[in-house]
UniProtKB/Swiss-Prot annotation:
CDD domains: Ribosomal_L16_L10e
Recorded GO CC terms: mitochondrial large ribosomal subunit; plastid
Principal location listed in the UniProt entry: plastid
Subunit structure as annotated in this protein's UniProt entry: Part of the 50S ribosomal subunit.
Top-level lineage group: Eukaryota
Family: Belongs to the universal ribosomal protein uL16 family.
The name this protein goes by in its record: Large ribosomal subunit protein uL16c
Localization in the cell: Plastid
Key words, A-Z: Plastid, Ribonucleoprotein, Ribosomal protein
GO terms for biological process, alphabetical: mitochondrial translation
A Gene Ontology molecular function term of the record: structural constituent of ribosome
Organism: Cuscuta exaltata (Tall dodder)
UniProt keyword Acetylation, yes or no: no
Amino acid sequence: MLSPKRTRFRKQHRGKLKGISYRGNHICFGRYALQALEPAWLTSRQIEAGRRAMTRNARRGGKIWVRIFPDKPVTVRPAETRMGSGKGCPEYWVAVVKPGRILYEMGGVTKKIARRAFSIAASKMPIRTQFIISEIE
């Protein structure tokens, strides 16, 4: 699972998922990509599940790039704990995804294989996504 090696602070505020993604919304490495259409927190488990599904489906051909990284800690309080006494402990990591963000990229495979691999990866995601193709050869 993906997680930062070290962070400056152990805990973070939740923040707001407003607006669209202005960074990471263009295809940079591959020819095909999976783009988010909704805002969400994607956990490191979900990102890894999508990556595994794509690598299994594409088999040996092609290369896959994961364009998001879970760098936000989510804290969870223990079950049946009274209110107060501070914030919970960091439990898992999430990547903040806004509409327009590229999640995965793929190159070196045919359009048919890429579309099939991305559709399987998209089924692992908690958000609507779209398959896009780079105009630049």
